[in-house]
Design a protein with these regions (language model features):
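Feature captures hydrophobic
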Residues: 33-36, 481-496, 500-507, 512, ...
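C-terminal segment of N-terminal export signals and the immediately downstream linker at the start
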Residues: 1, 22-45
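Conserved beta-strand hairpin/beta-sheet module of binuclear metal-dependent hydrolase folds
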Residues: 125-185, 310-315, 319-325
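Divalent-metal (often Zn2+) His-rich catalytic cores of metallo-beta-lactamase-fold enzymes
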Residues: 39-59, 330, 349-410, 414-449, ...
Length: 620
């Protein structure tokens, strides 16, 4: 019987590797690196470096293995253009720039860049189209005004809006462009939130007045339990999540060939005001059909897929299938680097399969909250089947390896997307990557522990790193060896030891600069924008410090105001530092007259604030 180590070593993908166009380039192979130590004049940072020979070789290999002959995405993304976005900048009400497409114009000036993976460059060029598009008569989209798309469906009395972007300023600008060319002055007659992520509801105040919602004039429709999961996923860990977004989304990383080039889902996240108006109607059943402003719609609830609560929508009279964010032009996240509960890829696959057989066999157009539509039943079925198989394979094959002993710290060097799916552009990793998604599958089923007792109660990095530095002979020896590994193109090995030095000596700027050089080369090599952004944003911080600038805030006061009282009290319990409340004892009974809620909050132990819905005898 083989040991786990022998089994892993026998696999064709063994070793530290990068997935490149359907095959792997091992870190120690000749396909990686030259010395890149001289600052690059064209770089946005004075310490920035050019791609090394090893990085150039990785990108060259990628170009030869990608399915560039398939041009269908290029035709689909430009189909139906009515009007482009004339002003490439959208200002926030607070006075700063909320959205700027001008900074991405460099992408269209060259066919290739030696610091951008060719597959990622292709995706960023596709996302560089912006404006108002006709999907079919009666359905329109504004794309390129935010990370997500906003869609308009013609109703009996007005326009039904699907997913009103991230911030009110971009949603308002999209609505203005739409009204100038198509809207005919008709109002918003309904709003549909497809799911709980902020880029699908945050701009609602840019298109509808809350008074019209509360009066019943404009219904806001969402999947069941929308508010609970919106708050738990976007607000409870909002501060930590917003910090992690700096890496995954490169929020303050300069846009340039050596920096930020897009986010895969769209070009970026707008930096305006996020708002939330609570839904007035929930889709509760697995399949629920009703009219929205005279348009018959069939809603398919898909809980625990791309989001904790999400729904697809089919419009039978138009043969139009809205797949929310369950099907996009990319592999999505099973585990998202910004942080969120790990998603269920098998469940996700099954709901895509259900949509295929319920609606996809007759649909003639499929559109979603990101990217571009697909036209024709054959094309729709191709995409649905491919994405269904992608998530099922990832779930099943990762667990197959896990059951043979591959751990969470090894699976990313073992799992590969099947060759037949790698050759489909819509299965490439422009949001989720095979590396971090495969680890997410193991985390979902087995948790973080790799069965090595050493990792059960590990020292914190700042505590363990000084010992490593001591045992390796001190800082200078690590610097010398780290530079040598860097110059040999062995970047993953180099980061392993130089990171120890930075953790042990956080003020050692020479060590931070070397680690930044290592991260930079790794970033250039990535097809996945989340991985690229994380490496390059980290390099930027190591060289400069934490950047400052305007970003969207998922825990904004407006979002907090939309909470129920119980959700707000839960949030208050998280914000409270229990260490400062030792010895305190209290009970608060609450009645909120505007909605009749009755709650009790208790602090009777030195541990936590607990809240529950009650009918108190003597509320105060």
């Amino acid at each position: 019987m083989s040991t786990r180590r022998q089994f892993i070593q026998s696999l064709p993908a063994a070793g530290t590797a990068f997935a490149v166009a359907g095959h792997l380039v091992l870190e120690d192979s000749p396909a990686l690196g030259q010395v890149a130590t001289v600052p690059l004049k064209e770089h946005f940072h004075p310490k920035g470096k050019a791609p090394s020979k090893y990085t150039l070789d990785v990108l060259k290999q990628a170009r030869t293995g990608l399915p560039f002959a398939d041009q269908r995405d290029l035709d689909e993304q430009k189909r139906g253009l009515i009007a482009p976005m004339k002003d490439l900048k959208i200002m926030a009400d607070a006075g700063h720039v909320a959205w700027d497409m001008e900074r991405f114009q460099f992408l269209d000036k060259q066919d290739e860049f030696d610091s951008i993976h060719p597959s990622l460059l292709r995706q960023s060029k596709l996302n560089n189209n912006y404006g108002l598009y006709e999907v079919i008569p009666g359905i329109y989209q504004v794309r390129g005004f935010d990370l997500s798309d906003i869609s308009f469906v013609r109703g009996k009395t007005g326009w039904i809006v699907f997913d009103p972007l991230v911030t009110k300023e971009t949603a308002r600008a999209a609505w203005k462009l739409f009204q100038q060319h198509v809207g005919q002055g008709m109002p918003v007659s309904a709003v549909i939130y497809s799911h709980t992520h902020g880029d699908h509801w945050g701009g609602v105040r840019g298109i509808v007045d809350e008074a019209d919602v509360r009066s019943g004039k404009v219904p806001v429709i969402a999947p069941i339990d929308f508010m609970d999961f919106t708050i738990s996923e976007n607000v409870y860990a909002g501060n930590a999540m917003n910090r992690r977004l700096f890496y995954q989304y490169g929020l303050l990383l300069p846009a340039s060939p050596h920096g930020y080039v897009g986010q895969g889902l769209g070009q970026a996240v707008s930096a305006g005001a996020i708002g939330l108006i609570a839904p007035t109607r929930y889709v509760e059943k697995a399949i629920e059909e009703f009219e929205v402003d005279g348009v018959r719609m069939v809603f398919q609830n898909t809980p625990n897929t791309e989001a904790p609560r999400e729904m697809n929508t089919y419009i039978p009279e138009m043969k139009a299938l809205w797949m929310a964010e369950n099907v996009i032009a990319s592999l999505h996240n099973i585990y998202t680097l910004r942080g969120a509960p790990v998603r269920d890829p098998l469940n996700w696959s099954k709901y895509i399969g259900e949509a295929l057989f319920r609606f996809g066999l007759e649909a003639e157009v499929m559109f979603a909250s990101h990217h571009w539509p697909r036209w024709g039943n054959d094309r729709i079925q191709e995409v649905l089947r491919g994405q269904r198989d992608l998530y099922a394979h990832m779930n099943n094959q990762v667990l197959h390896f896990a059951n043979q002993g591959v751990t969470i710290n090894e699976i990313h060097n073992v799992y590969e997307v099947p060759k037949g799916l790698q050759n489909k552009w819509f299965c490439r990793g422009y949001h989720g990557s095979p590396q971090h998604n495969s680890r997410g599958v193991i985390q979902r089923y087995l948790g973080f522990w790799d069965c090595n007792p050493t990792t059960l109660i590990p020292l914190s990095p700042g505590e363990s790193a000084p010992l490593y530095v001591e045992m390796m002979g001190g800082a200078q020896k690590i610097m010398d060896r780290g530079r040598q590994l860097h110059d040999e193109g062995r970047y993953l090995h180099a980061q392993e030891i130089v990171n120890k030095l930075v953790q042990a000596e956080p003020q050692n700027q020479a060590a931070k600069d070397l680690l930044a050089d290592i991260f930079e080369q790794l970033g250039y090599q990535q097809e996945n924008p989340g991985l690229r952004n994380s490496y390059l944003a980290a390099a930027y911080e190591l060289r400069t410090g934490i950047p400052q600038g305007e970003t969207a805030n998922s825990s904004s006061p407006d979002v907090i105001r939309a909470m129920s009282t119980e959700l707000f009290l839960n949030f208050l319990g998280i914000r409270m530092d229990s260490r400062k409340a030792e010895g305190m004892r209290f009970t608060i009974n609450l009645i909120t007259p505007d909605n009749g809620e009755k709650l009790s909050s208790n602090w009777k132990t030195p541990h936590s604030l607990t809240s529950r819905v009650i009918k108190p005898k003597n509320p105060t």
